């Protein structure tokens, strides 16, 4: 694929080496030259084969400084028609909207009693990464606590089919320290949630990029 002159110019700023996280974040700031506030992204390649269930990751992490993105939270429950902090609350009516692929939310939380109904909507919610799960904290009886966690900056992540984890860890108008703190939280969470089936070298590569830039590879041994 032919890259733009802008992209090629940014590539020329990146040396063929592994950067310390602090060096990488300083450089990342220089790469954020788009005319909008770009997202800071982490792309982590792990030595996992996700076709095996004991080599899959699906977990959550609370970013100390959040993602910088306002999210719309929907709750599916029969317990109440109004829940503080939720943008949408419903039960069968909200499920009917989802069945028609009407998705007006970024995060979906459900009470356990609604899961049999939601299971039928897996083909719609699954590909969008919106299917509630106990592992992600989105199937719970304590809905208020779950909402607060996501408002504080909790995000869900998982390995894709090739064993890579993709996450947003902030915006490029965050200062370097806040981006670093969020990045450390991600690394620690991925380490803590290492699957039982993982063997040998766990970390294959760890790269960061803006939404419009080439990636910078990190030396994951240099975390201070």
UniProtKB/Swiss-Prot annotation:
GO CC annotation: chloroplast; large ribosomal subunit
GO molecular function, one term: structural constituent of ribosome
SUPFAM superfamilies registered for this protein in UniProt: Ribosomal protein L1
Domain of life according to the entry: Eukaryota
Subcellular location: Plastid, Chloroplast
Principal subcellular localisation of the protein: plastid
Pfam families associated with the record: Ribosomal_L1 (PF00687)
Alphabetized Gene3D superfamilies for the sequence: 3.30.190.20, 3.40.50.790
Key words, A-Z: Chloroplast, Plastid, Ribonucleoprotein, Ribosomal protein, RNA-binding, rRNA-binding
Subunit structure: Part of the 50S ribosomal subunit.
PANTHER family: 54S RIBOSOMAL PROTEIN L1, MITOCHONDRIAL (PTHR36427), LARGE RIBOSOMAL SUBUNIT PROTEIN UL1M (PTHR36427:SF3)
Family stated for the protein in its record: Belongs to the universal ribosomal protein uL1 family.
General function of this protein: Binds directly to 23S rRNA. Might be involved in E site tRNA release (Potential).
Protein name according to UniProt: Large ribosomal subunit protein uL1c
Lineage, top ranks: Eukaryota, Rhodophyta, Bangiophyceae, Cyanidiales, Cyanidiaceae
């Amino acid at each position: 694929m032919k890259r733009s002159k802008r992209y090629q110019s940014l590539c020329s700023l990146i040396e063929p080496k592994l950067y310390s996280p602090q060096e990488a974040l300083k450089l990342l700031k220089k790469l954020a030259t788009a005319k909008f506030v770009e997202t800071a992204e982490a792309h982590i390649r792990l030595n996992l084969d996700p076709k095996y269930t004991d080599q899959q990751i699906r977990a959550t992490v609370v970013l100390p400084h959040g993602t910088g993105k306002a999210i719309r939270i929907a709750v599916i429950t029969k317990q109440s028609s109004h829940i503080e902090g939720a943008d949408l609350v419903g039960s069968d009516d909200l499920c009917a909207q989802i069945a028609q692929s009407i998705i007006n939310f970024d995060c979906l939380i459900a009470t356990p009693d609604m899961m049999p109904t939601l299971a039928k909507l897996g083909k719609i919610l699954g590909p969008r990464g919106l299917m509630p799960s106990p592992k992600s904290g989105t199937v719970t009886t304590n809905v208020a606590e779950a909402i607060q966690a996501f408002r504080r900056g909790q995000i869900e992540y998982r390995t894709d089919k090739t064993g890579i984890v993709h996450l947003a860890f902030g915006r490029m108008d965050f200062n370097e320290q806040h981006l670093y703190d969020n990045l450390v939280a991600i690394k620690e969470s991925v380490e803590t949630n290492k699957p039982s089936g993982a063997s040998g070298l766990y970390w294959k590569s760890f790269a960061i990029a803006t939404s419009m830039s080439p990636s910078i590879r990190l030396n994951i041994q240099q975390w201070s």
